[in-house]
Amino acid sequence: MARYTGPVTRKSRRLRTDLVGGDQAFEKRPYPPGQHGRARIKESEYLLQLQEKQKARFTYGVMEKQFRRYYEEAVRQPGKTGEELLRILESRLDNVVYRAGLARTRRMARQLVTHGHFTVNGVRVDVPSYRVSQYDIIDVREQSLNSVPFQIARETAGDRPVPSWLQVVGERQRILIHQLPERAQIDVPLTEQLIVEFYSK
């Protein structure tokens, strides 16, 4: 299955949640697209679980097969499966770049990582799904610092709050990972228990 590259607002409307963050088109029409978008539909338990799983997938830009692997890894962890799943998703490098305010959207963050603009602990990483660990240090590469996306990020620093589990330092926009996030530090509008129930069937 190919990665979805179509209009994200349409997916946001279908799943009734802002998958981008600050999507003005979604705010104007927060109901499903199509002729019968405003109609009230009785939602089954399965549909609610499926929608929650899809919300998580599209929020973090993860394909179904990879998302399933994340879930299976979360099951093996000692904590609550749903919380472990969110922690895995939050620790992706593209998400960390987004959370740090160096990209306006996760999709943009993914592109910046893919283009090789970052190092992790001094090693260049161009894999968006790379998982960061506690005490990792993420730097913008020297030759990338003056490119337009990072100039904009410096000018707009502070517009979006940076979560307390990471820190952005100075003009070099270094990201320090103090810890991996707890559930209370993850502000995505997801009910992770519904995802667990979906895969538990």
Curated annotation (Swiss-Prot):
Coiled coil: none
Keyword DNA damage listed: no
Keyword rRNA-binding included in the entry's annotation: yes
Keywords, alphabetical: Ribonucleoprotein, Ribosomal protein, RNA-binding, rRNA-binding
Record-linked InterPro entries: Ribosomal_uS4, Ribosomal_uS4_bac-type, Ribosomal_uS4_CS, Ribosomal_uS4_N, S4_RNA-bd, S4_RNA-bd_sf
PROSITE patterns the record matches: RIBOSOMAL_S4, S4
Any Gene Ontology biological process: ribosomal small subunit biogenesis
Pfam families on file: Ribosomal_S4, S4
SMART domains xref list: Ribosomal_S4 (SM01390), S4 (SM00363)
Signal peptide residues on this chain, from the entry's feature table: none
GO terms for cellular component: small ribosomal subunit
UniProt cross-references to SUPFAM superfamilies, sorted A to Z: Alpha-L RNA-binding motif (SSF55174)
GO molecular function, one term: structural constituent of ribosome
S4 RNA-binding domain residues: 91-157
Function: One of the primary rRNA binding proteins, it binds directly to 16S rRNA where it nucleates assembly of the body of the 30S subunit.
Similarity remark: Belongs to the universal ribosomal protein uS4 family.
Alphabetical list of NCBIfam families matching this protein: PRK05327.1 (NF003717), rpsD_bact (TIGR01017)
Assembly mode: Part of the 30S ribosomal subunit. Contacts protein S5. The interaction surface between S4 and S5 is involved in control of translational fidelity.
Protein name in UniProt: Small ribosomal subunit protein uS4
